[in-house]
């Protein structure tokens, strides 16, 4: 049976992650309160940020930036948007 959590990002009960996705306190916090669906949304956002900003993941500053953005995405006022990103419109 799937582990259900109250997702902090989606504001609804949803299936939780199978394991902490990151080391440390932030990973534990995400594991306890972020759903698989919300995590997949972050992976897409993270990919856009890496590509648009040409982040080198070997650079500790780039990794630190992404950690801050991860926390803002789930628990703050939202992560930065990729500069050229235009959300899709319905219709």
UniProtKB/Swiss-Prot annotation:
Keywords: Iron. SUPFAM superfamilies: YggX-like. GO terms for biological process: cellular response to oxidative stress. The keyword Iron applies. One of its GO terms (molecular function) is iron ion binding. The keyword Iron applies. GO terms for cellular component: cytosol. It comes from the Bacteria. Coiled coil: none annotated. Pfam families: Iron_traffic. Could be a mediator in iron transactions between iron acquisition and iron-requiring processes, such as synthesis and/or repair of Fe-S clusters in biosynthetic enzymes. NCBIfam families: PRK05408.1 (NF003817). Belongs to the Fe(2+)-trafficking protein family. HAMAP family: Fe_traffic_YggX (MF_00686). This is Probable Fe(2+)-trafficking protein. It comes from Burkholderia ambifaria (strain MC40-6). The lineage of its organism: Bacteria, Pseudomonadati, Pseudomonadota, Betaproteobacteria, Burkholderiales.
